[in-house]
Amino acid sequence: MDKKYDCIIIGGGAAGLLTAARLDLTAFSPKGTGLILEATDSPGTKLRMSGAGHCNFTHDGSVKDMVAAYGEQGRAIRRVLYRYNNDAFVDFLDRHGIPSFSRDGGRMFPKSQKAQDVLNLLLDLSVENGFALKKGFRVSQVTRLPDAGCQVACDNGAAFRTAAIVIATGGKSFPATGSNGRMWDVLSRDLDVEVISPRPVLAPVAVRSYPYGPVAGLSFETAELSITAPGKKIQRSVGDLLLTHRDFSGPAALNICGAAEPGDTLHINYVYPRSREEVTEILSGIFSGKKGNPVSALASRLNLPRRFCQSILLRSLGKPIDAEDVFRGSWNVDGLSPKKVSALLCDDTFTVESLPDWNKAMATRGGIALSQLDLRTMEFREHPGLFAVGEALDVDGITGGYNLQFAFSSASVCAEALQKKIRTDFRAEGLRLSTEE
């Protein structure tokens, strides 16, 4: 026997939960008639993971400046961001007893630094607004009904009818969290929804012959990374860089990952904004000295980790980086070339090896084409009553809270539109389905 609801939200992540937290169905019925279908046994998994569990939920500063963080799609979603901006979400949390603060260049966190606090708030407000949460319900089919409305069917055999559906199923990054991209296939098959081919973004950059495994863990506060290829516009990223055992990570690498294709060239300036000429001059002075350790001098003059300086000097001599050499205590300058070392420090070049694994990507580029939606409401133009929010859409931002901000902005715009639609269109057309047959 089909259950019938005013609104079904498919996906219990950040976007889906904020939609429910801001859509008050009890205004129409004391018990409310909303349903959240979560594919996994644990809603809000990615929200709990954000900011290493501390919940980097947005970025501070002017919303005007935020638009650029979304690349080519920034202009298209500008109105969505303005309708519910970063200050609005900060105020929302504050009103509900979750104060926040800014750190790391503008990243916003709850003062408790606990993502679970934000998740609990969204879950509680969803229930207050008349939504029930069903866990372990993965939608496998969406069908338009002859008398308007939709029916959704799940893998476990359950089926529900509703007047409105909100697609909040996320992208494909971290598929173990439930967002594996399967809902795109369902929408494309059942409703002919256009889906832009997805690719992983906000992930480490893997290169051929990566040399820094022995010094993994070293980081740089300000490095410049750029991607070049024949006939391709140069893409640049400046920020923190982390050397891991297998690849380049940290914000600078994560933010340029989306521009990198296998075979492209990755250029790294570890001492940005210093130029090769400036660094060559510094090195000439160091290497011409008769006393002292050039590694110590290099680390001090350029504010670099000592172990990294040893590694660079070894590479300039054509030697592999291994633990014994890296921790060797003394050096001489025989064979060291200021120009060779400067080239490695200011323009270290590598060939991009492959696209990142979905299990390492923090976000998705691609998804439901924005052209399918009326971005004033987040409703599909060709499918009245069907909405989409968050990472399920073809929108991705740089690291720093921007992707969660779009999730919250789009969810709020959607909730506002649905609040009006349920009050007017659905009731006028007799589509309120808050009973059981």
Model-derived regions, located:
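An anion/pyrophosphate-binding glycine-rich loop and adjacent beta-alpha core
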Residues: 41-43, 48-49, 99, 194-199, ...
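Beta1/beta-strand and adjacent pyrophosphate-binding region of the FAD-binding site
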Residues: 2-15
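A glycine-rich dinucleotide-binding beta-alpha-beta segment and adjacent secondary-structure elements
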Residues: 135, 311-396
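Short hydrophobic core segments
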Residues: 8-10, 37, 159-175, 187-188, ...
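Glycine-rich active-site loop/strand segments that organize a redox cofactor
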Residues: 52-102
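A conserved short coil-to-beta-strand element within the FAD-binding core of flavoproteins
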Residues: 135-148
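A conserved FAD-binding loop/helix module that cradles the flavin
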Residues: 173-186, 395-422
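Glycine-rich FAD pyrophosphate-binding loop
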Residues: 24-52
